[in-house]
Amino acid sequence: MQDLAFHLLAFLFVAAFIAGFIDSIAGGGGMITIPAMLIAGIPPLQTLGTNKLQGLFGSGSATLSYARRGHVNLKEQLPMALMSAAGAVLGALLATIVPGDVLKAILPFLLIAIALYFGLKPNMGDVDQHSRVTPFVFTLTLVPLIGFYDGVFGPGTGSFFMLGFVTLAGFGVLKATAHTKFLNFGSNVGAFGVFLFFGAVLWKVGLLMGLGQFLGAQVGSRYAMAKGAKIIKPLLVIVSIALAIRLLADPTHPLRIWLGH
């Protein structure tokens, strides 16, 4: 399976670079990499496992880039990242038990709601606002819950973390983006460990795409730090709506099946 033709490997590398760029700013890289791997003929389970491997490079690259500029303190936020990883482990392990159809059915509408929130809310910039919950409560509740979701299903995880950081933690948009990437790295580590245990990782493909992700995330995170909320907000809105449309357009989407289309 890993002996893919050169043009397919080149295609996956480019897809990973673009995904790394977009994901480092607004999340949603999986909506590029997962279809790309399926198009290349990689089976669904190996696609999910390999996606987590290459995603580690993108989220890790963006996290380091943001941390070097002081937008996230890795030591201080490590407990939060560990809770995200723990949630993702449970999510990946329980993926067969959780009603996946319900998640798939409601996710597009949640993403549209997030897009509307970020698109219509005025005065949302890079300045921190008053927090609605303590960091302790945020770490013990929302973080593992979103990490769990990432392990079970995945698409839109970055949008949910962004929403939590902005609305509950009171973070500015750029700071929220930086912290989102670190927690996304944590959930990627957790879910990747489970897929690795079950042997669902294609190393050659994952490492090649990981290089593309790393480079794309370096470019994307630098662009985000240069432009701040001016680029992060609109890209987050676009990515959320695009992901919602892609999910609804899928013939296997539960809503389309229930409606008989």
Curated annotation (Swiss-Prot):
It is found in: Cell membrane. Pfam families: TauE (PF01925). The chain crosses the membrane at residues 8-28, 29-49, 78-98, 100-120, 133-151, 152-171, 189-209, 231-251. GO terms for cellular component: plasma membrane. The keyword Transferase does not apply. It comes from the Bacteria. This is Probable membrane transporter protein ORF9. It comes from Sinorhizobium sp.
